[in-house]
């Protein structure tokens, strides 16, 4: 594939390049102004000299000569500065990119990648030899995989033979391009070997394995043929015909079973004696009739004289060349019109007769897939035959280095072995083709060359991978790109940048939804320039060096036991961090919520604390996952982080629109642990409490355990308290002297007076369930009661189902300002009822007041 880069005008440059360019521009402007001034002076003096019309050397003439020399010098400086500026302007910067377009590369473009024109006019870049370096001189072999003529010199400004060294400059100080007359190597910087490519001209074309073996196979979809048939043609196990014929359809000529087909192929003429006749008398009548019927077709018949003979126009080909011919003969516009017509007929049939059958649906999806692929080729103006490779690009040598080890041995990358494999088979095929070798041998070499290129692109995709001497699969180009250790995720997406950190994430039970716990040591390093600036502003440190020394000592002693000056440093850090958003990212960033903004909360330790509700968006858990921290520097970036990327502003999934902030991870585990029973602890079933608040007091005083089984007086209804099956079958009934009765059940107890009226009831529960119930009632008191439901039904008469109410709230969420959304929805965040307790509950501050909910509902009519 090839990439096309579009650049904006004027280009946006990095700060360093901008400063350098500005310096050059300023120097050019200064030189230009001085030259203009000198030119004016020289013009005035020239007028004086011309008026005198004298050849004598007067002071004015001397002054004129001096000024003119200075003007020439200034013009030279101006020219040099402009050349440097134009040269600097040609330097490519990644910030100049506006977009990147990928498409299939043509053979001509691939050759242009590796072809380079030397100053003497000679073009180099084609690799023809499989050798890497000379093991006697330890220098790269010419025309090999490390050729200095094609990729540039190994040493700066030194040729291959060593006869030409150094760089020559012209009068303006610009290096003169030179080429060694003996070895033909261009003298320049050796860094060019890191980005200069080469190419291999293949004697026989090969099919790109990604387009053949992918799912679905792009070649199969485009040619409308099964992948197995294309693989058989590509790997030279079957021929491709230029046109179909009935002679190739045995089922049409001989519609028989497979067993008879085998007997037909092996039939021979022979005479049977009487013994054979007696033996074959037991054959079934159907078998005899079939043999007689088909025997007439199988018998040889001579050609009658006078019949016209014609040559079969079909042509047979094999290998990638056959695939290329079929792709070249494909008319994309005609095929697109035919496919559109067939698709229109199928859609009309579906509209007229109802649902299509399964076969018609498969055919319809197949037509759509092929039509989309053809449209892609037409839009990108790419040719289908470019999927067959004729020129193979070669990576720069510094990206596949070869290193000398101790003892005279060499270590190299696997790509060099794969390139050597391709070159050896390509050169051998060329020799056999010139020798007019047998067709069988040529066919075998075609298959070997195809397999060598397959191993270079994606080793092991076809089946058995190419192994090295230690039976280890060689690492191909695809292996260097894909996976966690590949070029994209490891070196591009996962590379280290300034003002960033990385650490393990743990749950933060006391955090709010938009907060995260940031270790103090990490925060001090990330915000170091801002902390130093504030220390200097507060006159805590006289200079930058002393401020760094204070910070270093504060980190060395740790934030647990700080001294007075350390406390000043940590207080300064807290002042800097307050209200400053940070970005958290978890790789791989598969969607928008993979990176979100949080307000940092300084904590001790070295792990980042994260809110459990945002784990779904990050697809994170707390089993050792790591996350990266990034600091937005500019005011625009901080504003974007606060207004758009804050976690409390991203409550809905961008893909489905459903809430993505749902309880998970430690929240669910904490609720389960809080409400579970533990029958193995000390029995406390004899304890009775008059209210829920008494249970909480006893728990905080340590009189009962979190999982203790207790009896609590309950004023409301309990589950099953009015059920007939419980009232009819009590475990025990007690009656006191006053006529009061106790009805004891397994989960609750009911007390009645002498008239049968219910006096009180006790339920059997645990301390944790009481705590959980209190938390729910304490922090969700804004729940939709009857009055709020009436208001919803007034505004939405048809909204009587929970999904309708949910859609109403989602619509309400989308209609309001960003800052109002968290308060309006009031989603929970985890916490603990008291320090050291294993419970998760939503803090009260994260919920909206019931009056706010009513106010938002009243504003619905403004839509």
UniProtKB/Swiss-Prot annotation:
Residues 23-36 have a biased composition (Polar residues). One of its GO terms (cellular component) is mitochondrion. Disulfide bonds: none annotated. InterPro entries: DNA-dir_RpoC_beta_prime, RNA_pol_asu, RNA_pol_N, RNA_pol_Rpb1_1, RNA_pol_Rpb1_3, RNA_pol_Rpb1_3_sf, RNA_pol_Rpb1_clamp_domain, RNApol_RpoC1. It is found in: Plastid, Chloroplast. This is DNA-directed RNA polymerase subunit beta'. It comes from the Eukaryota.
């Amino acid at each position: 594939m090839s990439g096309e880069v579009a650049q904006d005008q004027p280009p946006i440059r990095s700060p360093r390049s901008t400063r350098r360019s500005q310096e050059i521009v300023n120097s050019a402007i200064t030189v230009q102004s001085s030259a203009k001034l000198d030119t004016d002076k020289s013009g005035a003096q020239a007028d004086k000299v011309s008026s005198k019309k004298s050849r004598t050397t007067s002071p004015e003439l001397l002054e004129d000569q001096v000024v003119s020399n200075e003007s020439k010098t200034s013009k030279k400086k101006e020219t040099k500065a402009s050349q440097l500026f134009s040269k600097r302007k040609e330097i490519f910067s990644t910030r100049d990119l506006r977009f990147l377009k990928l498409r299939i590369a043509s053979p001509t473009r691939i050759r242009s990648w590796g072809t380079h024109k030397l100053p003497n006019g000679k073009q180099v870049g084609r690799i023809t030899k499989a050798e890497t370096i000379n093991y006697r001189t330890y220098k790269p072999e010419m025309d090999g995989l490390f050729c200095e003529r094609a990729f540039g010199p190994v040493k700066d400004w030194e040729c291959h033979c060593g006869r030409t060294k150094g760089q020559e400059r012209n009068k303006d100080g610009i290096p003169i391009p030179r080429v060694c007359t003996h070895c033909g190597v261009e003298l320049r910087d050796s860094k060019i070997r890191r980005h200069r490519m080469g190419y291999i001209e293949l004697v026989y074309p090969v099919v790109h394995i990604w387009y053949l073996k992918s799912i679905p196979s792009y070649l199969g979809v485009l040619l409308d043929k099964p992948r197995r048939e294309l693989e058989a043609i590509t790997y030279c196990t079957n021929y491709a015909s230029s046109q179909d014929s009935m002679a190739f359809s045995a089922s049409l000529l001989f519609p028989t079973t497979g067993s008879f087909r085998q007997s037909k192929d092996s039939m021979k003429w022979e005479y049977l004696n009487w013994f054979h006749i007696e033996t074959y008398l037991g054959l079934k009548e159907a078998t005899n009739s079939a043999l007689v019927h088909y025997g007439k077709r199988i018998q040889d018949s001579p050609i009658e004289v006078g019949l016209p003979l014609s040559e079969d126009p079909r042509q047979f080909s094999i290998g990638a060349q056959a695939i290329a011919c079929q792709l070249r003969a494909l008319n994309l516009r005609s095929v697109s019109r035919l496919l559109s017509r067939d698709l229109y007929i199928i859609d009309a049939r579906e509209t007229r007769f109802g649902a299509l059958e399964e076969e018609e649906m498969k055919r319809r999806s197949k037509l759509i897939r092929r039509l989309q692929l053809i449209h892609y080729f037409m839009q990108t103006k790419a040719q289908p035959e470019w999927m067959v490779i004729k020129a193979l690009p070669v990576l720069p040598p510094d990206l596949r280095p070869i290193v000398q080890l101790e003892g005279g041995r060499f270590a190299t990358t696997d790509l060099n072995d794969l390139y050597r494999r391709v070159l050896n088979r390509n050169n051998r095929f060329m020799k056999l083709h010139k020798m007019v070798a047998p067709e069988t041998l040529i066919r075998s070499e075609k298959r070997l060359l195809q397999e060598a290129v397959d191993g270079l692109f994606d080793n092991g995709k076809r089946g058995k991978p190419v192994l090295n001497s230690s039976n280890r699969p060689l690492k191909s180009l695809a292996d260097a790109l894909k996976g966690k250790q590949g070029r994209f995720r490891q070196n591009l997406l996962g590379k280290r940048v300034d003002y960033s950190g990385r650490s393990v994430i743990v749950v933060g039970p006391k955090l709010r939804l938009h907060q995260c716990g940031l270790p103090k040591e990490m925060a001090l390093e990330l915000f170091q320039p801002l902390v130093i600036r504030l220390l200097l502003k507060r006159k805590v440190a006289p200079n930058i060096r002393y401020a760094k020394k204070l910070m270093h000592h504060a980190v060395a002693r740790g934030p647990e036991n700080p001294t007075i000056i350390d406390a000043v440093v940590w207080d300064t850090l807290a002042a800097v961090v307050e209200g400053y958003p940070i970005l958290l990212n978890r790789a791989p960033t598969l969607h928008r919520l993979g990176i979100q903004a949080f307000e940092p909360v300084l904590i001790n330790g070295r792990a980042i604390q994260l809110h459990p509700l945002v784990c779904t968006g990050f697809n994170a858990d707390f089993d050792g996952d790591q996350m990266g921290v990034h600091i937005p520097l500019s005011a625009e970036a901080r504003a974007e982080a606060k207004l758009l990327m804050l976690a409390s502003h991203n409550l809905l999934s961008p893909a489905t629109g459903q809430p993505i902030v749902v309880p998970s991870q430690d929240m669910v585990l904490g609720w389960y642990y809080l409400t579970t029973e533990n029958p193995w602890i000390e029995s406390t079933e004899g304890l009775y409490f008059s209210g829920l608040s008494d249970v909480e007091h006893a728990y905080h005083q340590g009189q009962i355990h979190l999982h203790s089984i207790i009896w609590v007086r309950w004023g409301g209804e309990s589950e099953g308290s009015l059920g007939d099956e419980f009232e009819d079958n009590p475990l025990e009934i007690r009656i006191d002297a006053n006529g009061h009765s106790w009805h004891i059940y397994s989960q609750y107890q009911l007390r009645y007076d002498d008239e049968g009226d219910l006096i009180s009831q006790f339920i059997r529960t645990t301390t944790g369930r009481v705590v959980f119930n209190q938390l729910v009632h304490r922090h969700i008191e804004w729940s939709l009661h009857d009055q709020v439901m009436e208001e919803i039904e007034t505004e939405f008469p048809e909204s009587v189902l929970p999904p309708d109410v949910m859609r109403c709230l989602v619509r309400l969420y989308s209609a309001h300002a960003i800052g109002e959304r968290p308060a309006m929805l009031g989603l929970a965040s985890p916490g603990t009822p008291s320090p050291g307790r294993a419970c998760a509950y939503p803090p009260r501050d994260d919920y909206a007041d019931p009056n706010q909910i009513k106010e938002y509902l009243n504003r619905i009519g403004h839509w």
